[in-house]
């Protein structure tokens, strides 16, 4: 079964309970179970986990369990390094603080223990045990105490630092904390003098830096390319360098210098001058401790240059002090060996040249410095002129003047000046090197003056050197083959340059020199001879060389003219090749960069895919764990409920008391139930056995024993009662005696105090008299002040009450005014509401009246439309019957005319006499048509005089009956018949005149409609949409009659009208609006009594249709006039209601 896991807050409470009962290990196990479960990573925030973590680390520190603390810290980092970095920082700092406090307490305890041991016995300080321990182990009491008490805590603190550094080394959010902990670790090593731990710490930090540099191209983690990271690493290495110098670990200091130089070279930003000055200062110190005087002087020179150029507030004394330091360090450099190539025979990892080149890189020099180059640089910077007179003389004596007899004496004066001057404390380490350089200068200068010299004489000249040191220097000079020296101990002499065949190099002295050595002169004899002979030849033949030069010049010029074109082409070709090569290289580089970019993109894509896959796997793993945790929680809950249920019974408590927590966690619900049943059975068996044993004991023997015990118990109780009475009486007697004695003492005390009564009474009387006079004075003052205050308050109250009454009066007056204004306002508002209500009722009445008029008008319009429709149907039927009759009559007279193509006059008269009958019938039919048209037109007039919607209704009616209108209206005569019409007829003389008159009528009609539609008052409830009868595309009364009907009878004389050509009718056709206006005009003209049209003479032409129709004058009906007035009146007042509806 899975292990039981508590919630974090419950685990914290349980851990506190274990700590209170003195079980910290059990408390740590309880908290560790929570961390190992990992369930809290996804369910709780840092506010819940942080107290738990502090308690967990506290227990780890108390129990010195650094590995357990590391596990918890790593779990906490994984949870909160991206969520709440401050919480992680607080936890780590708190952990380290607790470890440091315990370590300091252990140190204090160790010192106290040693002090106690030392002060234990002053008469016997050296005990036999201490003597034996010191002889065996070689340690004192303090060392042994530290090893026993302090060392475990030091080890724990060191492990804590290492764990925190390992924890934070790849977290970009905790870089500052990482470097702070590194500095704390350096301080730890300094405080407890842990050199081996300091070396391991340096190696660890260097390894971390290498890992950062290797993984700098990754998208996550710490990147060395960031400026902040570089600065933090640089500051940490500078602190490491200071700590290494303090602990005198020069190898670690040199490695730190290499790291610092690498970081400064990697940074794109130039380090600040302060950092560079600190770097050069520490570098010079490391070189000095390493015994490398050459690079020590070079570092000081770089520091001097930097300070002189960038420090603006540099005083003259500081500049002189720094210049003296640089000059003395440079002059203290040992004279270089003439044959450093001997070092190549010594097996080493790196040659001296490579080492020197590496050190020069640390100083930012292009090549390793030499003593000569440094002295030249010192002179260039005018350093000898900046120092004091003594140091300037030192430079001249060593590097300029040639005076071997007084050299050591002069240098000894400078040495004494340095040793005696307190301000020259920094220059004291250079004294021995300066003496060695002086001795070497002395030997070289002596070798140029003497061939041999006595040892004693040389010792006199070298005043600060003994015979052994001098001999050692001589041997070193010979060893490096710098000089030819032979020591003759038998004669106690020294010989210089006696062998003239041993000069193997060109001697170039770097200091003051008088002449060359004899061996050097022999070696350069041929060279000198060549030089002298060349000079002699130039003097004997002064023009030979000039002629040779001119001849050589002419040859060169001629040769140049011969090859200049070829060389020019070659140069151009070479330039072209170079350009092509550059283009090729550039293309190769571009291709390589593109390939690299593609490769990096592919790697990045693969990395993203891998990261995505990893995240998916982690998500799946989390889901799986969460599912397992849920199942585990359910099981644990059921187990907990089962345990609680069992613990409520006596046998269950007994069964659980036999099991510890680990045992309970290992069991499941079934096993616990099984244990419970077993416990019940066992208790039942024990109860049965107890009952059986009791049955055996309850017998007569037991009763007899108890009967015998009764007298004994009675006797014991009687004796005990007597003893208790005696004890009470004695105690009571003692109490009474004590009370009597106390009363006697009290009475005696009272008698002694009674003698003080007179004095007491006198004192009280005097005190009362004094206080009474003071009381009377104060009472009078109080009463006077009270009376004044009472008068003042009465006056103030009078004034205040007057003001209150005045304010009350003004307030009542103002309230009365406001009340009256409010009444007036309410009355006005009531009147306005009544007026508004009356206006509203009036408007409603008017609206109702308009609505009734509109309904009445609408009923009239519907009646007119119904009549128009009935007339149209009737006219259509009459026209159809008339057409049939016309067809029949045409068929009757046409054959008769055809039988007599050349008839006589009488026959012609007979044929013509038949026409009037037809004409009469036609006239009657035309009269009916005209009457029908009159009715239709009158109906149209009524519709047109109506409102806007009525006009549109009439227009729609005319459009719908387009065919019928064209059938019953009076036909237009041909042009020839109109021309033959009588002059006195009322018909128009021509088609143009007729059209013009129709247009005037149409314009009048539109103007009349515009006057009727004008609204002289305000328009209410009006829809301002576009009016269909005023459309800009159709005009006021324009209508589209469409194509003419093809079944319309033809106007030509003779023949069938169906066979007539259409183009003739199309040419004579007029616009529909014009034809309508003409028909209206003709109809109204007939009503006004105009004369009917008459045919011209001889106009019959054999076709009865060409005869003019006879029209009768019809007076206008009074009913129609009255209806027209009523419609017009209704239209003037109620057009808005019609439009709205």
Swiss-Prot record:
Q: What molecular function does GO assign, one term?
A: translation initiation factor activity
Q: Name one Pfam family in it.
A: PCI
Q: Which residues carry this modification: Phosphoserine?
A: 908
Recorded GO cellular component terms are: eukaryotic 43S preinitiation complex; eukaryotic 48S preinitiation complex; eukaryotic translation initiation factor 3 complex; eukaryotic translation initiation factor 3 complex, eIF3e; eukaryotic translation initiation factor 3 complex, eIF3m; multi-eIF complex
Extract the ranges annotated as region (Disordered): 588-631, 829-1141
What residue spans carry the Basic and acidic residues bias annotation? Answer: 588-623, 829-899, 920-976, 990-1051, 1059-1087, 1110-1131
Q: Which domain of life is it from?
A: Eukaryota
Record key words, sorted: Cytoplasm, Initiation factor, Phosphoprotein, Protein biosynthesis, RNA-binding
> Is Repressor one of the keywords?
no
Q: Where is the PCI domain?
A: 319-501
Q: Which compartments does it reside in?
A: Cytoplasm
Provide the transmembrane region boundaries. Answer: none
Q: Which GO terms describe its biological process?
A: formation of cytoplasmic translation initiation complex; regulation of translational initiation; translation reinitiation
| Family statement | Belongs to the eIF-3 subunit A family.
What this chain does, per the entry, is described as: RNA-binding component of the eukaryotic translation initiation factor 3 (eIF-3) complex, which is involved in protein synthesis of a specialized repertoire of mRNAs and, together with other initiation factors, stimulates binding of mRNA and methionyl-tRNAi to the 40S ribosome. The eIF-3 complex specifically targets and initiates translation of a subset of mRNAs involved in cell proliferation.
Subunit field text: Component of the eukaryotic translation initiation factor 3 (eIF-3) complex. The eIF-3 complex interacts with pix.
Question: Would you tell me the protein name for this molecule?
Answer: Eukaryotic translation initiation factor 3 subunit A
Source organism of this protein record? Drosophila simulans
The gene that this protein is the product of is eIF3a
């Amino acid at each position: 079964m899975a292990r039981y896991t508590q919630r974090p807050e419950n685990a914290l409470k349980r851990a506190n309970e274990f700590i209170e009962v003195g079980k910290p290990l059990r408390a740590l196990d309880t908290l560790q179970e929570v961390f190992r479960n990992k369930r809290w990573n996804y369910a709780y925030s840092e506010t819940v986990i942080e107290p738990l973590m502090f308690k967990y680390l506290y227990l780890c520190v108390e129990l010195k369990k650094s590995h357990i603390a590391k596990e918890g810290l790593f779990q906490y980092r994984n949870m909160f390094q991206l969520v709440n970095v401050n919480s992680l920082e607080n936890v780590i700092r708190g952990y380290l603080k607790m470890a440091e406090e315990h370590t300091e307490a252990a140190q204090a305890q160790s010192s106290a223990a040693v002090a106690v041991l030392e002060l234990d016995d002053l008469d016997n300080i050296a005990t036999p045990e201490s003597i034996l321990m010191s002889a065996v182990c070689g340690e004192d009491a303090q060392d042994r105490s530290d090893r026993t008490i302090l060392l475990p805590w030091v080890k724990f603190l060191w492990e804590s630092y290492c764990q925190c550094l390992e924890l934070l080394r790849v977290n970009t959010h905790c870089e500052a904390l990482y470097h702070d902990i590194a500095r704390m670790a350096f301080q730890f090593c300094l405080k407890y003098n842990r050199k081996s731990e300091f070396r391991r710490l340096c190696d660890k930090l260097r390894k971390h830096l290498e890992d950062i540099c290797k993984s700098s191209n990754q998208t996550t983690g710490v990147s060395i390319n960031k400026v902040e990271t570089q600065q933090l690493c640089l500051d940490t290495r500078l602190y490491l360098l200071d700590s290494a110098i303090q602990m005198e670990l020069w190898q670690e200091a040199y490695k730190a210098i290499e790291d610092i130089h690498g970081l400064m070279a990697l940074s794109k930003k130039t380090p600040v001058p302060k950092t560079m000055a600190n770097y050069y200062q520490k570098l010079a110190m490391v070189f000095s401790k390493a015994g490398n005087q050459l690079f020590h002087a070079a570092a000081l020179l770089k520091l001097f240059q930097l300070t002189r150029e960038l420090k603006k507030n540099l005083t003259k004394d500081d500049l002189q002090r720094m210049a003296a330091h640089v000059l003395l360090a440079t002059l203290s450099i040992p004279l270089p060996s003439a044959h450093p190539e001997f070092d190549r025979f010594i097996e080493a990892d790196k040659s001296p040249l490579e080492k020197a080149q590496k050190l020069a890189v640390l100083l930012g020099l292009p090549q390793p410095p030499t003593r000569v180059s440094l002295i030249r640089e010192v002179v260039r910077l005018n350093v000898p002129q900046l120092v004091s007179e003594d140091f300037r003389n030192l430079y001249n004596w060593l590097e300029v003047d040639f005076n071997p007899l007084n050299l050591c004496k002069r240098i000894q004066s400078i040495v004494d000046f340095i040793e005696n001057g307190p301000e020259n404390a920094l220059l004291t380490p250079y004294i021995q090197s300066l003496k060695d350089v002086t001795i070497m200068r002395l030997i070289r200068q002596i070798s140029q003056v003497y061939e041999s010299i006595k040892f004693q004489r040389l010792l006199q000249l070298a005043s600060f050197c003994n015979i052994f040191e001098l001999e050692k220097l001589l041997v070193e000079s010979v060893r490096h083959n710098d000089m030819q020296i032979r020591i003759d101990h038998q004669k106690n002499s020294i010989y210089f340059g006696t062998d003239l065949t041993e000069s193997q190099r060109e001697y170039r002295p770097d200091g003051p020199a008088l002449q060359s050595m004899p061996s050097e002169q022999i070696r350069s004899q041929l060279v000198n001879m060549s030089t002298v002979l060349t000079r002699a030849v130039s003097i004997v033949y002064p023009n030979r060389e000039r002629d040779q030069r001119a001849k050589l010049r002419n040859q060169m010029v001629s040769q140049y003219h011969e090859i200049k074109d070829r060389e020019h082409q070659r140069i151009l070709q070479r330039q072209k090749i170079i350009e092509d090569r550059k283009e090729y290289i550039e293309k190769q580089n571009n291709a390589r960069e593109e390939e690299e970019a593609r490769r990096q993109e592919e790697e990045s894509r693969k990395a993203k895919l891998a990261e995505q896959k990893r995240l998916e796997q982690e998500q799946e793993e989390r889901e799986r764990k969460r599912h397992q945790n849920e199942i585990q929680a359910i099981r644990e809950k059921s187990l907990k409920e089962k345990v609680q249920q069992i613990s409520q019974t006596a046998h269950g408590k007994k069964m659980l008391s036999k099991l510890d927590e680990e045992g309970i966690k290992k069991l499941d619900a079934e096993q616990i139930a099984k244990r419970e049943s077993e416990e019940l059975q066992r208790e039942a068996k024990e109860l049965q056995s107890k009952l059986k044993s009791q049955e055996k004991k309850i017998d007569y023997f037991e009763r007899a024993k108890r009967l015998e015990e009764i007298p004994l118990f009675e006797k014991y109780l009687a004796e005990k009662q007597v003893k208790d009475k005696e004890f009470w009486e004695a105690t009571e007697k003692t109490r009474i005696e004590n009370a009597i004695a106390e009363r006697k003492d009290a009475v005696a005390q009272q008698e002694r105090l009674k003698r003080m009564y007179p004095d007491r009474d006198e004192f009280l009387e005097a005190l009362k008299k004094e206080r009474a006079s003071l009381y009377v004075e104060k009472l009078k003052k109080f009463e006077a002040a009270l009376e004044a205050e009472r008068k003042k308050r009465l006056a103030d109250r009078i004034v205040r009450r007057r003001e209150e009454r005045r304010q009350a009066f003004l307030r009542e007056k103002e309230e009365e005014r406001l009340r009256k204004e409010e009444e007036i306002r309410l009355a006005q508002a009531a009147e306005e509401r009544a007026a508004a209500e009356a206006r509203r009722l009036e408007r409603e009445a008017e609206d109702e009246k308009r609505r009734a008029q509109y309904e009445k008008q609408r009923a009239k319009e519907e009646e007119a439309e119904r009549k128009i429709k009935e007339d149209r149907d009737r006219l259509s039927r009459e026209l159809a019957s008339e057409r049939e009759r016309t067809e029949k009559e045409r068929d009757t007279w046409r054959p008769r005319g055809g039988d007599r193509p050349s008839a006589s006059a009488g026959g012609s008269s007979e044929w013509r006499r038949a026409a009037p009958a037809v004409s009469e019938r036609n006239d009657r039919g035309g009269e009916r048509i005209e009457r029908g048209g009159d009715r239709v037109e009158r109906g149209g007039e009524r519709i047109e005089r109506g409102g806007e919607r009525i006009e549109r209704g009439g227009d729609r009616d005319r459009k719908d009956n387009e065919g019928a209108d064209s059938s019953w209206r009076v036909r237009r005569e041909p042009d020839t018949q109109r021309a033959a019409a009588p002059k006195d007829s009322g018909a128009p003389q021509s088609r143009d005149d007729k059209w013009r008159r129709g247009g005037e009528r149409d314009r009048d009609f539109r103007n009349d409609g515009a006057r009727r539609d004008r609204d002289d008052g305000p328009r209410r409830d009006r829809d301002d949409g576009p009016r269909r009868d005023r459309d800009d595309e159709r005009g006021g009364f324009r209508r589209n009659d469409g194509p003419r009907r093809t079944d319309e009878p033809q106007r030509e004389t003779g023949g069938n009208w169906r066979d007539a050509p259409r183009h003739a009718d199309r040419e004579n056709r007029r616009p529909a609006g014009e034809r309508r206006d003409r028909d209206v005009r003709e109809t109204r003209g007939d009503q006004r009594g105009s004369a009917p049209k008459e045919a011209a003479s001889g106009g019959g032409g054999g076709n009865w249709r060409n005869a003019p129709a006879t029209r009768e004058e019809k007076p206008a009906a009074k009913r129609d006039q009255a209806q027209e007035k009523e419609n017009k009146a209704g239209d003037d007042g109620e057009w808005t209601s019609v439009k709205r509806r």
